[in-house]
Swiss-Prot record:
EC supergroup of this enzyme: transferase
Pfam families to which the protein is assigned, alphabetical: FtsJ (PF01728)
Taxonomic path: Bacteria, Pseudomonadati, Pseudomonadota, Alphaproteobacteria, Hyphomicrobiales
Keyword Methyltransferase: yes
Gene name tied to this protein: rlmE
Function: Specifically methylates the uridine in position 2552 of 23S rRNA at the 2'-O position of the ribose in the fully assembled 50S ribosomal subunit.
Stated name of the protein: Ribosomal RNA large subunit methyltransferase E
Subcellular location, record wording: Cytoplasm
Amino acid sequence: MAKDTTGRMHVQVKTGGKRKLSSKLWLERQLNDPYVAQAKRDGYRSRATYKLIEIDDKYHLLKPGMTVVDLGAAPGGWSQIAARRVGAEAGKGKVIAIDLLEMGEVPGVTFTQMDFHAQDAPEKLRAMLGGRADVVMSDMAANTTGHRKTDQLRIVGLVELAAHFAGEVLKPGGSFLAKTFQSGADAELLAQLKRDYATVRHVKPAASRQDSSERYVLAMGFRGGEPAELL
């Protein structure tokens, strides 16, 4: 264990047995990530929770009484924040969450384990909603192949799928938030969002690792068909 340039203790993991270097580096990063440590102290399920907190604190997506859809919800950090901020824990708002993986119960959240790629997934989600949503948010990530262009197209395709669903279920004035990655492959997606929302912007929360190309596309003021402003 050594100190880094900020004076914090830095944990180093030895490579032993069958542990791969990539696994060692991932584990080291987790152990030395201040957001991971903070999430444990605050009782949040993942460091990603702070990304939504920062975005919502700035743009005020989540309000009491709202209905929210959380796509790719596991392990539940975003659902936790959404449930608290819309009042779902007290039965005032509603949070519908899905993921391909299992997710432990979150107070105020209705969760179903399903593959969003499945043909019947949108229909099942609409039935769970029982009406329109105020916010559709997605922290889904596509499986990577290691081939940069292929991975970019997969990620954009996943966001396009989420955006299409949002266009089917959002109330007028609703918002769409989705994880994406910086690339030149999302021009068509942005053009569609500009037609459907009043404002479209990219945001990179402080909790997003600075060495990552991860960012979020935030579309607000759902209206469909009218030109929007890209910020």
